[in-house]
Amino acid sequence: MKHMIQNKQLTTSEKQKAKSEKRKTKNEKRRRDSIIPIKLYNTATKKKQILKPYRANTIRMFVCGPTVYDYAHIGHARTYIAYDMFVRFLRMAGYTVAYIQNITDIDDKIITRAREQKMIPKDLARKFEKEYRADMKNLLVISISRYVRATSKIKEIISQVKRLLEKKYAYFTPDGIYYDVSRFQDYGKLAGRTALSAEDSITRIDESVQKRNKGDFCLWKSAKPQEPKWKSPWGWGRPGWHIEDTAISEHFFGPQYEIHGGAVDLIFPHHQAEIAQMEALSGRKPMVQIWMHTGFLRIGKEKMSKSLGNFTTIRDAMRTVPAHVLRLFIASTLYRSPILFHESMIQQARENWETINSMYNTIRLMHARIAHNTNAKREISRIQQYQKQFRAMLADGFNTPRALAIVFTYIKFIQSLGQSLSQETRAAALEFFTDIDTVFGILQKQKLSAIPRTITNLVAKREQFRNNKQWQQADAVRKQIERAGYCVEDTPSGSRLRKK
């Protein structure tokens, strides 16, 4: 009897456990079934390809962060907002994303600026790292899993340099340890360059009369007076720029992972150097499945950069341009294309944001009809069709301008219904807006009481008159709306309602 009771208790426990496991399996299957396949343009292959996680539905992504010696400018905003929206989409699409961004907190530029400011380099770097992270918070960049300082991985950097020396990919000079690019057959392939053309690059390349090849870059710099330094097997020194990123990515992701991103000016030599280092160390190819690069943000015909002195800091820009508008401005251009920063473009983004946000709040605050109507099924089907198209545009090369075009078509459809929405239609419409905000991070709830049903009915009535080209009647309804304390504005994207 005792044995039977024990069996019964065990069976009950097992049943509970089995139910729990069944729920987990069901949820996991639902999650797998909802995963959206994604195609991305790969800089390395110059074509779009399907993203294939090495681990089940998990994406590891590394993006080159800032060198923290000054305030970040809106060129940085363009890059980091674009990647923020991309990672938001990956997560919405059902993927688990580990997104790491490095902080270059030791570099020649930091040392030079610290000397100019009569500061300790570490203090200068900490100051501007703090300011950068504050800028990202203000820009609603929320997707980064972890920031990693280069100086937090000195041990890993030394390990990589040591292994490159052992494999004969590196050599000693009086001023440091250099990578021999002639030893890496594919050097320059990422950018369609050769090792001999390295000196033509506009980005940082280490100069030394002791180098074997013009394109060779420094892995470990010998210590100089009054500069930060760390102890190594080769004496005191500090890391070169390129080795910092591979030390971080190898530590967290291993020698191969899914996505590496940065701005287009990092393709050569920086990202090519990373490939040369990591593939030489591991013997595995490719280091990264897909390389993503954001286009320049331009002022006139020039890219915005600190070196050219034509930059606007993020905090200065945000004095007149809210984060929601700046994010929509950036989403309006394909991430890998150049984008022109001009007042007319910002104004267009401002107007587009007003249209989207106004419609969102109109639906959110309206009194929905309680009764189901005969058109609800058709209306919901159309909304879900637009929602599906929106996701499809993002899944095909992360084409944000095409996705936004779907959003404006959807808004016009909602306006064309010409009546207050049923509960079912309103719920479907808000679900689509949730998708829009999940990816773009642009919606802002109005702090208003619900829009009275009489007003939404008047707006719908006016829209019907406009659709029928009954302009006099539409104008009369507009005046009624205005007398009630609201304004209705007509734009190319449709009508917007706001409180006076």
Indicate residue ranges for each PLM-predicted region:
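The substrate-binding groove and active-site-proximal loops of carbohydrate-active enzymes
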Residues: 114-121, 145-151, 263
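Active-site pocket-lining segments that scaffold enzyme catalytic pockets across diverse folds
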Residues: 132, 137, 142, 161, ...
